[in-house]
Amino acid sequence: MNNLKQGKFITFEGGEGIGKSTQSQMLYEYLQSQNTPVILTREVGGTIVAEKMREILVHEELLPMSELLQAMAARYDHMARKIIPALQEGHIVICDRFIDSTVCYQGLELENGIDLVYNLHKTLMPSLMPDITFFIDVEPDTAIKRVNSRNMNNKFDIRGIDFYKTIYYCFKELSNRFPERIKTIKASDLSPLEVHELIKKHL
């Protein structure tokens, strides 16, 4: 915990179709039931301005650097207007996606992209990283079947299995690089409730 924060910052990460949003919502509802001050938000988005940027990011084909800067601009607004104030008030903040998604979705398209994204984040938002990140580990073949069954149509949903595998192995690499922060929850064969119970054990 750094001196910018009084609360706790929890993020959920992984590819498409893995249940991040479901788990974020379940944890939010659980903490509410415990009378814990908590907010639930998401990226890209979370504020009026950032949600408008999201529409461009998920539907338009941007140049790789433009896409990265769009994501970072949205995050800066989100952090300044919502996440940091909530943490300073002592809330737990649960965020569906954060910096690790930017690394895997935008950084891989750029030379030295992983370090570039983390360094840019540190420049814009020094010392502010999640306290704990849950990587929901679902095999790409399972994830793409889930996405196809729900008929989603943003540009990331409709990319093929090679894209899903690239994203998956990127998150695996990050979980190995930052094992103290990123907790891997193997979820391919588990129900949402079983995944939720595993997550609670890390709190």
Swiss-Prot record:
* Organism classification: Bacteria, Pseudomonadati, Pseudomonadota, Alphaproteobacteria, Rickettsiales
PROSITE patterns cross-referenced by the UniProt entry: THYMIDYLATE_KINASE (PS01331)
Alphabetical list of HAMAP family matching this protein? Thymidylate_kinase (MF_00165)
Q: Name one GO biological process term.
A: dTDP biosynthetic process
Protein's name according to its UniProt entry: Thymidylate kinase
What sort of enzyme, by top EC class, is this?
Answer: transferase
Tell me what reaction this enzyme catalyses. Answer: dTMP + ATP = dTDP + ADP
List ligand-binding residues for ATP: 14-21
